[in-house]
From Swiss-Prot:
Keywords assigned by UniProt, alphabetized: Acetylation, Disease variant, Hydrolase, Magnesium, Metal-binding, Mitochondrion, Phosphoprotein, Transit peptide
Phenotype upon changing residue 167 to L: In SCFI; decreased inorganic diphosphatase activity
Oligomer status and interactors: Homodimer.
Binding site for Mg(2+) 2: 169
Sites of N6-acetyllysine modification: 224, 261
Family of this protein: Belongs to the PPase family.
Related illness: Sudden cardiac failure, alcohol-induced: An autosomal recessive disease characterized by sudden death due to unexpected cardiac arrest following ingestion of small amounts of alcohol. Sudden cardiac failure, infantile: A disease characterized by sudden death within the first 2 years of life due to unexpected cardiac arrest. Some patients manifest hypertrophic cardiomyopathy, lipid accumulation in myocardium, degeneration of mitochondrial cristae, metabolic acidosis, and elevated plasma lactate levels. SCFI transmission pattern is consistent with autosomal recessive inheritance.
Protein name: Inorganic pyrophosphatase 2, mitochondrial
Cofactor(s) needed by this chain: Mg(2+)
Gene: PPA2
Record CDD domains: pyrophosphatase
InterPro entries attached to this UniProt entry: Pyrophosphatase, Pyrophosphatase_sf
Native organism: Homo sapiens (Human)
GO molecular function: inorganic diphosphate phosphatase activity; magnesium ion binding; protein serine/threonine phosphatase activity
Amino acid sequence: MSALLRLLRTGAPAAACLRLGTSAGTGSRRAMALYHTEERGQPCSQNYRLFFKNVTGHYISPFHDIPLKVNSKEENGIPMKKARNDEYENLFNMIVEIPRWTNAKMEIATKEPMNPIKQYVKDGKLRYVANIFPYKGYIWNYGTLPQTWEDPHEKDKSTNCFGDNDPIDVCEIGSKILSCGEVIHVKILGILALIDEGETDWKLIAINANDPEASKFHDIDDVKKFKPGYLEATLNWFRLYKVPDGKPENQFAFNGEFKNKAFALEVIKSTHQCWKALLMKKCNGGAINCTNVQISDSPFRCTQEEARSLVESVSSSPNKESNEEEQVWHFLGK
């Protein structure tokens, strides 16, 4: 545990508002050959947006147009590194929203056309997650699986709570610090059922399929074996992270037990079905923006020219009023 605490205390410089880049190792080079990002506005400002393009340079929605699962057709013959044949069927695309050790709460803008990544704004202010001793920012590379949706009108059969109206979240536990906007391939290991203000907010535990240690990880027990203390720290982080903002501790289904890979895959399957209903206009999506360019039978599909017009309507001018959160440590005693 002492080794884990030393690791968690090692954070990025306070001035690093947002880590951006196009590559962070073998897996990222492969993924970024398929997807690219384009910034508009200035990081750490309310007008900042990070849009996505496919390999041909056309704008896409990361929420809707990036496939949930990795497959040979999508990869165009690019070989996987160290992936076992029986695991290849369970490789998923993950969109990285928040690099490990950073505080800016970046998220896919589900209610905006083309769903760029932006920084979450609450009460007119940019949202930053607090540093709770001994942690620094997010303690994993944090992001989401595309083509998933936790339906706010449907009770989860496991938690008996409605969904949180977002794609399913992922905590990537690999050895590399990734970049906002990267699309990587991950192996699913398990899942945690967070109940956030009465809503189901699943947290997948996964590892980059091209991480140097990925071959050792196949299920949730491998996390306990090879990264002792990490799951306990994850549970504690999610329990406390809203307390500095004056909110109560979060609760969990299953008494905070991490469920295994098989359970996690069923949850992913369910959220993917909810997303399909959303894109086919078979359920109430509310304010969710379903504009896409690649889902052929979706009534929300638009042309490449229309997608370009939507992106170009967003201001690309730098905002001089960028703001970085003051870095303080919160000590929460019991």
